[in-house]
Amino acid sequence: MGLPWYRVHTVVLNDPGRLIAVHLMHTALVAGWAGSMALYELAVFDPSDPVLNPMWRQGMYVMPFMARIGVTDSWGGWSITGESVSNPGFWSFEGVALAHIGLSGLLFLAAVWHWVYWDLELFRDPRTGNPALDLPKIFGIHLVLAGLLCFGFGAFHVTGAWGPGIWVSDAYGITGKVQPVAPTWGPEGFNPFNPSGVASHHIAAGILGFIAGIFHIAVRPPQRLYRALRMGNIETVLSSSIAAVFFAAFITTGTMWYGSATTPIELFGPTRYQWDSGYFQQEIERRVENSLNEGLSLSEAWSRIPDKLAFYDYVGNNPAKGGLFRAGPMNKGDGIAEAWLGHPVFQDKEGRELTVRRMPAFFETFPVILVDKDGIIRADIPFRRAESKYSVEQVGVTVSFYGGKLNGQTYTDAPTVKKYARKAQLGEVLEFDRTTLESDGVFRSSPRGWYTFGHANFALLFFLGHLWHGSRTLFRDVFSGIGAEVTEQVEFGAFQKLGDRSTKKQGAV
């Protein structure tokens, strides 16, 4: 037949049986990949430290998606929250992975069956015997099924009526766990950080989809609309389906990059804007201030700060810091976090408290500058010592630690002070193991960054695909001309089965 590689999908253009077959095979590949990827991630995942070495630092991609809808335990006896588990049941990480692989095998067999038995009576008009599909009715059936699935997820899985619930956490990603969520029907349901909206919106969207599906099954489209939108052409279905997919990809790109309601920071890592806005830094300062007001010492106040919160306040966990083309998990960059060393407070010889200006997300390198409470530069690590006026040695800077591993310790020697000033530029001071994974010191992005980049690109490609196929179906008569023999040739080809010379039609051009 000699079709070029970019035209091979013509084979299923007017062949519903094999169109079903290739979709089944595609779904088999997707399910098989998901299950296999989950098993691979489980093989390399280290569950020993959920606070400083969580799944997003290790580069896990499919595990966070399982965890956010209630799968948190392993047959290995561990949970991502750090507890030991004695009886996780079938719906563990391994169980979900094997279920996907089993589903993939069944879908493969179904694809083979539909490829072999492609010419079913179901695809023929009983009155004429000609191949015919009632595409508006098929659209309605799909809407009904999608609506039922959507409603079921919101009404049963999320609410815990028949399912585990979803991952719910506080605003700072400290206390997250899987729990049932009750739907909310007031304006608070539209708060993008309110998990109750997940339940209510799925219930509402499911009901709407079901009603819309019944409508499209029962009510025929007007003839003019049917013709104007080419509702009888399978390429119209392709075009509108691509539109639905690229729209969903754009939406989830935004919710992944900017939001954390359905993509919790405990599972996917912090967002870029939490670093840019000093989100965790402000919360830490608020907690310390409250503790001081209660009469605690500075050391006691900082010792109350959870390691988890301090760990978030570190630029290396910012997904925008990693660069798009540096392969590997975050741990391959700065290393495996082992401990929070504490909060460093710098002082000059005149007793002024100094703060290291933090590195913005955009910069790879940034000068180490220490400023006082009024924002005036009092010390730095100079590029050229010959012209230096504010060097650590000249200003006599010391550093004291509060909270963490170095709580209560003070350093006065300049090399040590400069070492911690460089670390403080990146946020809270942490200790990393760089040897185990041979980490190279170059920041990596988190799965949040990978997902966003991938789906933004796919959404753009699918948008162009929607325009292409939409144009083809709307202007098909312009492209191919009009006439009985041309329609026969373009629509159905010279063969009953495209490319199969044994099924040559009589009277075809």
Curated annotation (Swiss-Prot):
Kindly give the membrane topology term recorded for this protein.
Multi-pass membrane protein
Q: Does the keyword Ligase apply?
A: no
Q: Name one GO molecular function term.
A: chlorophyll binding
A biological process (GO) of this protein is: photosynthetic electron transport in photosystem II
Task: Spell out where the chain crosses the membrane.
Answer: 21-36, 101-115, 140-156, 203-218, 237-252, 457-472
Indicate where this protein resides in the cell.
Plastid, Chloroplast thylakoid membrane
Main location group:
plastid
| Coiled-coil annotated residue ranges, if any | none
UniProt-listed SUPFAM superfamilies: Photosystem II antenna protein-like (SSF161077)
Q: Which UniProt keywords apply?
A: Chlorophyll, Chloroplast, Chromophore, Membrane, Photosynthesis, Photosystem II, Plastid, Thylakoid, Transmembrane, Transmembrane helix
Cofactor: how bound = Binds multiple chlorophylls. PSII binds additional chlorophylls, carotenoids and specific lipids.
Which is a Gene Ontology cellular component entry for this protein?
Answer: chloroplast thylakoid membrane
Could you give the subunit structure recorded for this chain? PSII is composed of 1 copy each of membrane proteins PsbA, PsbB, PsbC, PsbD, PsbE, PsbF, PsbH, PsbI, PsbJ, PsbK, PsbL, PsbM, PsbT, PsbX, PsbY, PsbZ, Psb30/Ycf12, at least 3 peripheral proteins of the oxygen-evolving complex and a large number of cofactors. It forms dimeric complexes.
- Which family does the UniProt entry place this protein in? Belongs to the PsbB/PsbC family. PsbB subfamily.
Query: What does the UniProt record say this protein does?
Result: One of the components of the core complex of photosystem II (PSII). It binds chlorophyll and helps catalyze the primary light-induced photochemical processes of PSII. PSII is a light-driven water:plastoquinone oxidoreductase, using light energy to abstract electrons from H(2)O, generating O(2) and a proton gradient subsequently used for ATP formation.
Q: What is this protein's name?
A: Photosystem II CP47 reaction center protein
